[in-house]
Amino acid sequence: MRIIEKMKLKGNSTFWCLAGIFLTGALPLFTNYCLNSSEVSYQLVRIENMKDYLSAGIFQMAMPVNWQYEHGTAGLDGNLFWLLPVLLRMTGAALESVYRMFLICIYAVTVCFSYKALEEGFQNKKTAVIGTALYCWAPWYLDALYGRAAIGEALGYAFLPVLLLFLVRAVGRKKGKLPQWLLLAIAISLLLQSSFAVLEVGMLPLVFCCVYYRRQLLEKDGWLTLGKAAAATLLCNLWYLLPMLRYLVAYRDVAKYVGSRPFQEKGAFLLHYLTFFFQGGATYDYKSNGFQGTAAIGVGPALTGLFFFLLWLKFSGALQKKNSKEDSTAGLFWCGLLGILLSLGSFPWDLLRQNAVFQVLTFSMQSPAIFMIPAICGLTFIGCGLLNAYREGKSATEATILETAVLAVAFVSTQFLTNKLLLGRAPLWIRQKEDLPDVVLIEAPQFQMSAAAGAAQLGAVALSVLGIVGIVIYCILTQKKDPDRKVRKEAA
């Protein structure tokens, strides 16, 4: 909200550009019904079920893996942020209205956080706005919101720019208002409370950049930052991690069963990255149906076009700029290419999942297509880097033509997809509990927290609260000391 207020106060057109990005991508939410997606009924039942439990004094911390579907449908998605629609529902608001309001909030967060990360990474507002459009209009993300209603994954995607912001600052040796270790702890905590699957995928850019930029991230201060972030994350999320550990131990057979099911056949084709216009279909079984009625997964034609334009500039010798060691673009780009490889159905996932470690790591994922997330991040950063380099090496007119073309392609393809979803998906009219379909939720007592919880659970909650309070006090005291040090240095 502070970002929006600052842009309004400055009278900057950036606010209206971001508002346009938001309105374009959130178009299917401005109706009085829900689009009938593959998992929207599940999510509506989830809200109503949480409301009933909360009325009885029980908070469901996370959703267990629905093994009946042979994949991790909302598996280990946290319910902390779902308190927003649940509390609105408890005030008497219509069920589908609170669901759409929740999605509107998620999309607004995606726009704000992605702009912040890109603006700090490239120090150019125009580039950041274009990058925000590319990130927020990615077909995979729009399909997660409206096609599959995989809200946990969409929520994790919205918070992922916080992790990217940490990487931008760490690689560039920049400092913000928050300490680096706290920023990383917040990023991991947000992903953990959103989706376990996105948390695992989000760790891929972090681990990859730690190896790629080991001089910046794995020096003495870097190890200290990672250690403090890990300790803060464990302490502040102990109330959540302890029940999850108990669940994984109690239902290890379920995890092993789901983790051993066919997974590779649900991977994407390379053609998904090259297709310009999707029909907004609902088919995710690409091995059996190919592209017939395929869902709109991919990075978008604008990012694909920028990638091939980059290759042409590189091989033609028109782009001679070398990447700086303090620029995170190159590392995220190579990580994005790795994400493309991991998302394909030709990657030997089924062979790897014969190992128990890979079964545990991937049992909460629905398909390899979730690795499109780092692919989108990497291509967005390299695309923004290309726009910056092109602006420096070419005339203002040529740079403006390229930027306009990128935005036009992204806008037209997004309009095509959202309109296809609106025109092709049947409306789902659900106002009250009686309108809900018969969807059975898998319950796990390990995830139910109430006043009658055991001593271990209450102790974990107390430690987490004390940890959060302690970190806040530490940051306040640290910020007070820094101005004093600056004053002393200036006086000296």
What are these regions (language model features)?
Residues M1-P28, E398-L407, V465-A491:
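Start-transfer (signal-anchor) and selected internal transmembrane alpha helices
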Residues L235, I297-K325, F333, L337-L338, ...:
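Hydrophobic, aromatic-rich transmembrane alpha-helices
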Residues G25-F122, K126-P161, L190-A197:
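Active-site lumenal/periplasmic loops and adjacent helix-entry segments of GT-C-fold
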Residues Q216-L226, F309-D350, K394-E398:
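Membrane-interface helix-loop-helix junctions at transmembrane boundaries of multi-pass membrane enzymes
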